[in-house]
């Protein structure tokens, strides 16, 4: 799975760009504010329908332009496909696949599985549970065909239930929602638990390579007491939920906790160690997908050198090379990525939103 070509129009500070990409490493080098992260963000947006630095379309559309347009050619298991995404300032989104309109962003996400490693990505480890749920849900989305529909339906039903909690006085008035919510909640929790169990060995092995000085452990918490029946719990906690005006337990409260030597990682590890752990988690997840489905992720690394010394950069570079996946890396200077440059790599110089191929020695 790789992008062979990327066209960018009116995205962030990039007016227009047409990039022929390497199947291996693609390096984006330039000073801070040059637009190199914008290229990474364009790749991410093409596969997710939204940017990773802003959820508001207006903030990623170039100044005084009506919309941004992204287009890519995808080499997917010896089959080439065309994908396109545009979004207006009003938030209107258009997805095109192989020349036809009317497609969903979820289809792009299936075609372009990506792992994102950014300075903001520490939220996976020290942020709220929603970031770790997203980690599990990425895996479930790519491994369980019914997950996306089930999770979308559950979120819709929970939103309706929460709205109803503000208006009802008896549990019988809300039972109809619970009868639909309960089977979805249990199925989603089972998928998440199965995925966390299945990927545990991959995570442990990769973490042992990156952080051998720690004994790491992982725990999936489904969002309600494991000894309790979810349906009975919803009925029992109705008065509490009504007072809170939201549903306090369920898959939307699940978490995936990580400990080092018995201590939460965010309380023990340094910034550099947390970045290595984040890289290990993303790599393990991508490699697990490849082994299960034969599909390779795209890896996006922003500000690669920050928090990592030379030895750790080299370790990460070697592991990324071993995946044989397509990798996009941003850095301030070519020297920072010297250990990663190889015969399958391509260097791009980015300045003021202009992108040029830079010859390699």
Swiss-Prot record:
Disulfide bonds: none annotated. It comes from the Bacteria. Its main location: cytoplasm. GO terms for molecular function: ATP binding; single-stranded DNA binding. GO terms for cellular component: cytoplasm. It is found in: Cytoplasm. ATP binds at residues 30-37. The RecF protein is involved in DNA metabolism; it is required for DNA replication and normal SOS inducibility. RecF binds preferentially to single-stranded, linear DNA. It also seems to bind ATP. This is DNA replication and repair protein RecF. It comes from Yersinia pseudotuberculosis serotype IB (strain PB1/+). The gene is recF.
């Amino acid at each position: 799975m790789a992008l062979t070509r990327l066209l960018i129009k009116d995205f962030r500070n990039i007016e227009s760009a047409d990039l022929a990409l390497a199947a291996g490493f693609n390096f984006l080098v330039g000073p801070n504010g040059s637009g190199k992260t914008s290229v990474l963000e364009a790749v991410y947006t093409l596969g997710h329908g939204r940017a990773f630095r802003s959820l508001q379309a207006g903030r990623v559309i170039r100044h005084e332009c009506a919309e941004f347009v992204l287009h890519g050619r995808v080499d997917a298991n010896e089959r080439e496909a065309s994908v396109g995404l545009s979004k207006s300032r009003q938030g209107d989104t258009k997805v095109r696949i192989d020349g036809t309109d009317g497609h969903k962003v979820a289809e792009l996400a299936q075609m372009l599985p990506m792992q994102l490693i950014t300075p903001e990505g520490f939220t996976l480890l020290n942020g709220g549970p929603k970031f770790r749920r997203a980690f599990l849900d990425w895996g479930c989305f790519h491994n369980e065909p019914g997950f996306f529909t089930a999770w979308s339906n559950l979120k819709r039903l929970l939103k309706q239930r929460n709205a109803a909690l503000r208006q009802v006085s008896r549990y019988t008035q809300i039972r109809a929602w619970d009868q639909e919510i309960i089977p979805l909640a249990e199925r989603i929790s089972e998928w998440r638990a199965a995925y966390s169990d299945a990927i545990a060995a991959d995570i442990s092995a990769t973490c042992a390579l990156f952080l051998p000085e720690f004994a790491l452990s992982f725990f999936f918490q489904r969002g309600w007491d494991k000894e309790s029946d979810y349906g009975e719990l919803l009925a029992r906690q109705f008065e509490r939920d009504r007072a809170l005006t939201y549903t306090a337990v369920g898959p939307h409260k699940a978490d995936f906790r990580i400990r080092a030597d018995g201590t939460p990682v965010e309380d023990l590890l340094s910034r550099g160690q947390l970045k290595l752990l984040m890289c290990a988690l993303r790599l393990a997840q991508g490699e697990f997908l490849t082994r299960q489905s034969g599909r390779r992720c795209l890896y996006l690394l922003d500000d690669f050198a920050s928090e990592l010394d030379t030895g750790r950069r080299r370790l990460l570079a070697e592991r990324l090379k071993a995946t044989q996946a397509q990798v996009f890396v941003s850095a301030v200077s070519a020297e920072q990525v010297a250990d990663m440059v190889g015969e399958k790599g391509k260097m791009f110089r980015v300045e003021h939103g202009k992108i040029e191929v830079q010859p390699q020695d």
